[in-house]
A protein has these predicted regions:
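Short, small/acidic-rich helices and loops at N termini and domain boundaries
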Residues: 1-96, 360-369, 373-375
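Glycine-biased, small-residue-rich flexible motifs in mid-sequence functional cores and linkers
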Residues: 1-5, 17, 79-375
């Protein structure tokens, strides 16, 4: 890939909040270099104009690629032979009316010796609560070690709790693991997993849809979950609440035609409530051993039916309200223009959500700027 093309891919990776179907269609139709130039010159569809309004003048592609190169990483697109075409086919058949974000990534930023396509062909995702119990961590380690014995790679999201236990157990067993981040490759989140991400980058693979320097938001975690589900030929939920990120990943797996599994736990444990609900409602297959997961991974050609499950972790905020809420700083205040850039929205579309957040008691305005309300 020449430098002009590489910079164009890096530019489109940042210019609109992913995934964006309009941007993907433009790149497919015009080529990435021409698409990037049309966005810069504002010669695009009205809807894409709005989606790229806040960031089209922010061209940090050269800096982003410099960070990537210094880390020893690489940029992956569908033009690369490492691109996991088969893993992403589920996005084509998903119900896009129910799940508008059921789209393959446009670009992936990657770090590590493992090849994504090879891993996706023989992988299982293990996900669960951040507040894992000793039981949950034990089961996770046992499952991960058993999968490694059977040459199955482990995909997870790099969070505290079950995710971290899955990554650590896989590395300890000398297997391959993939951490799918909701932040840039150079942003260790959670910070306590910085050393773990370094180890994964040395022995497995760390991937992200977001360019360097991107800080994670709740919306990005939910968007990231679709990739965890897509890259695992089966998704195993070890411990989870009813409304949780793990339950959201399980819902994505089902929507993409992947097998969903859940590990039962003590009936007195709140950490296992989400797993029990999935099993009771027949939204997941009960598993207790790695061999059972491997059997299901081998059945990936038989797609699970779409049961029309609603999203599991959506509160009363609309998508725009959530984006604006996440753009507000943890401390201090920001102007409307600054909020628009962070949220990836036109400034004219930020005021409405800010007003609704104010009505809900979530945000307040002081001296022309906005900040989170104390709760």
């Amino acid at each position: 890939m020449d430098q002009v093309t590489r910079r164009a891919w890096a530019y489109v990776s940042r210019v609109a909040e992913p995934p964006n179907q309009l941007l993907a269609d433009l790149v497919a139709r015009e080529g990435v270099v021409a698409a990037a130039e049309r966005i810069r010159s504002r010669n695009v569809d009205r809807r894409l104009l709005r989606a790229t309004e806040a960031r089209h003048e922010i061209d940090s592609a050269a800096d982003d690629l410099d960070v990537l190169d210094r880390m020893g990483g690489r940029l992956l697109t569908e033009d690369d032979d490492e691109w996991p075409y088969l893993a992403f086919t589920g996005f084509r058949s998903a119900d896009h009316e129910k799940r508008p974000h059921a789209l393959a990534p446009l670009v992936l930023w990657a770090l590590g010796p493992s090849r994504l396509r090879d891993i996706a062909d023989r992988s299982a995702a293990i996900v669960g609560t951040r507040a894992a119990t000793p039981y949950g961590e034990y089961v996770t380690a046992d499952l991960a070690a058993g999968l490694v014995e059977r040459d199955v790679a482990v995909v997870s999201g790099g969070a505290y709790g079950i995710d971290g236990a899955a990554h650590r157990a896989t590395l300890a067993s000398e297997g391959e693991t993939v951490a799918v981040l909701a932040a840039g490759l150079d942003v260790s989140y959670p910070a306590g997993h910085s050393a773990l991400f370094h180890r994964i980058g040395k022995h497995g693979l760390v991937v992200s849809e977001y360019p360097p320097g991107t800080r994670p938001t709740r919306r990005q975690f939910l968007t990231r979950n679709r990739l965890v589900a897509a890259l695992g030929r089966a998704t195993v939920v070890v411990e989870a609440g009813v409304r949780s990120g793990a339950a959201n990943t399980a819902a994505w797996a089902d929507a993409l035609g992947r097998r969903v599994c859940a590990v039962p736990g003590p009936i007195t444990s709140s950490a296992s409530v989400g797993c029990h609900v999935l099993i009771r409602e027949e939204k997941a297959i009960l598993v207790t051993r790695a061999a059972e997961v491997v059997e299901l991974v081998g059945m990936v050609g038989e797609l699970a039916p779409d049961r029309g499950r609603p999203a599991c972790e959506l509160d009363e905020l609309s998508s725009k309200e959530l984006a604006v809420y996440e753009a507000l700083p943890g401390r201090g205040a920001r102007s409307v223009e600054e909020i628009a850039v962070t949220a990836g929205m036109p400034a004219t579309e930020v005021l409405g959500p800010l007003t609704m957040l104010n009505v809900r008691g979530l945000a307040i305005q002081e001296e022309g700027c906005w900040k989170l309300a104390k709760r």
